[in-house]
Each structure stands twice: as structure tokens, then as C-alpha cells.
């Protein structure tokens, strides 16, 4: 049961970015998952603060990464092209410009998405590809995959070096509202497996929830400790923001 309803909102919202000096968030990870098949998520990126994991993200364009708004920093190092953090063969690209959705709220995490503009283009390859943005929203019951380098244990943390994946199912707003009450907003999407620990956790924030080959969610928040049965993970529902994503990339080319 979500004890979070009794906690202050900033504690309840597992804002899933690893804490760094001067930043507001605390991270999310993959619980009860397994290493992703090598190269199966070529759009996955890690946002680093120095060499430390801060958040996940997803490549939507050679110059643009989509992530959660609560992952905002002044500067980013973007890791892409390898499932292993610290791999010297990976591309590492600096980024200093980011654009939060104008409707984002630090209190409720509504509209929790942000575009990060890379200082130079990513080199596309078999290991670096753009994710496909959705043309429609997927229905409840759809099986999706969430991925990230976040902690695999909670409340104690154990961070993997290899990208982790777990399959979850989309949950209807009606069923998710039974857990989170008025904390759930129209821009949010819930996913999980009933009576299972399968979920995202610290460090996974901003990472992709991919359903049938399209990006449907970005890891946003959940209850703590992570992986509590019947407490779904909460994601930003990307299908409701495709126009903002495309308009923002065009405006800031």
C-alpha cells in the first residue's frame, strides 16, 4: 500500500534523479529486472554529472535528448552508444542547453519532461538510434519495457554498470487513481505488474518506457522504497506531448 499519501509531496514523489549538489531531485532505478539484450535499446542515454549517473534519457534527434524535467542541471555529459557505463567506446557529448515544458510543476511533477540540446550531433549507428515518437496513445494492458541504470535494490542502493530492463503493463487511469488518489494528473501514465516488485527506481528518471516500438513514457515518480507490490510506477505520457516536442526542437534549431 502506498504510505506515500501520508508523506509530504516532495518525499512522496520519488523524483528519480540521483542527488547532486544544487539540484532538487532524488533518483529512480530498475527493480526485479535483468540486463537488457545487448544493443536492444540504442536510443537509451545516460545523463551524467561529471562521471556520476544523474538520470536516464532517450535520443529523439541527432541533436536532442528527451528526459524528465526534474532532471534539469546547468550542464550535462550525455553517454550513448553503449549499454555499459564507463565504456570507453561510448560516445560522450556535452550539453549546456535544456528546455523544460512550460507547464512543469516542481510540486506535483505535472508535465514532467524536458528537451536537452547536445552541443554536437550524435553519430548514428547500430548502437545509436533515434527512438520513434508516438502517433497515438497505447491502451491499458499493453506490455512495455522500461530501462535504465538506476539502483536495483531499495531502500539500500546497488547501481549496475550494465543497462537493465523490465517488462511492465500499462494500467488504466481509473485503477491507478485508486492508489495515488488526487496525485495523478492527466499528463501521467501508470505501469506495473500486480503483486510484483517490477518497477523503476533511483537513477532511472527520464528514461524510456517503450511500447510496441514507440516511446510512450518517461520515468517520473513512484513510492519509496521502490518495488512495493501494487504501487505502479508513474511516467510522463509522451503521446500527449509530441507537438510540444517537435515545436520546441524546431524553435531552438
Swiss-Prot record:
The keyword Cell wall biogenesis/degradation does not apply. The keyword Disulfide bond applies. Pfam families: Trypsin. The gene is KLK7. This is Kallikrein-7. Its main location: secreted. Induction: By estrogens and glucocorticoids in a breast carcinoma cell line. It comes from Homo sapiens (Human). It is found in: Secreted. CDD domains: Tryp_SPc. GO terms for biological process: epidermis development; extracellular matrix disassembly; positive regulation of antibacterial peptide production; protein maturation; proteolysis. Keywords: Disulfide bond, Glycoprotein, Hydrolase, Protease, Secreted, Serine protease, Signal, Zymogen. May catalyze the degradation of intercellular cohesive structures in the cornified layer of the skin in the continuous shedding of cells from the skin surface. Specific for amino acid residues with aromatic side chains in the P1 position. Cleaves insulin A chain at '14-Tyr-|-Gln-15' and insulin B chain at '6-Leu-|-Cys-7', '16-Tyr-|-Leu-17', '25-Phe-|-Tyr-26' and '26-Tyr-|-Thr-27'. Could play a role in the activation of precursors to inflammatory cytokines.
